[in-house]
Amino acid sequence: MARLTVEECMGRTNNKFKLVILASQRAHDLNSGASPVVKHKNSKNTIVALTEIANEQLDVHLLFNLAVQRCRKYMEKFINSDDSYVVHKSKDNIDIFQKNATSNFDELGANSLNVENSKFLDGDNFFLTQKE
């Protein structure tokens, strides 16, 4: 694929923003040492990731679940951090994101880290394949 366009990748997902999540996760995997499944010559990992998605050579559900797990690990580190900026903030000045993230994380509990048990994808029609 000499010139890859977003439209060529849209057959795998119904939303450009979801495509960005998928490509980002795959590029992260490639940067971490994963082997590409397509042949490429001096292409950047972002282009390789989009090519793999467009050629339907990846399980997009698995890729999305990996992205969710990576995001949850990041959020868990942020919420549980001993960062002096977060610790010394007065309770009145806690920003809305941090307050909501902390309360939602406490409500979800430890079981929320298991993507298979999560109802996050139920009924969302998150991925549209050409077979559907």
Swiss-Prot record:
GO terms for cellular component: DNA-directed RNA polymerase complex. Gene3D superfamilies: 3.90.940.10. It is an enzyme of class 2 (transferase). It catalyses: RNA(n) + a ribonucleoside 5'-triphosphate = RNA(n+1) + diphosphate. It holds the Pfam family RNA_pol_Rpb6. Signal peptide: none annotated. Keywords: DNA-directed RNA polymerase, Nucleotidyltransferase, Transcription, Transferase. Its EC number is 2.7.7.6. One of its GO terms (molecular function) is DNA-directed RNA polymerase activity. One of its GO terms (biological process) is DNA-templated transcription. The keyword Transmembrane helix does not apply. Promotes RNA polymerase assembly. Latches the N- and C-terminal regions of the beta' subunit thereby facilitating its interaction with the beta and alpha subunits. Belongs to the RNA polymerase subunit omega family. The RNAP catalytic core consists of 2 alpha, 1 beta, 1 beta' and 1 omega subunit. When a sigma factor is associated with the core the holoenzyme is formed, which can initiate transcription. This is DNA-directed RNA polymerase subunit omega. It comes from Ehrlichia ruminantium (strain Gardel). The gene is rpoZ.
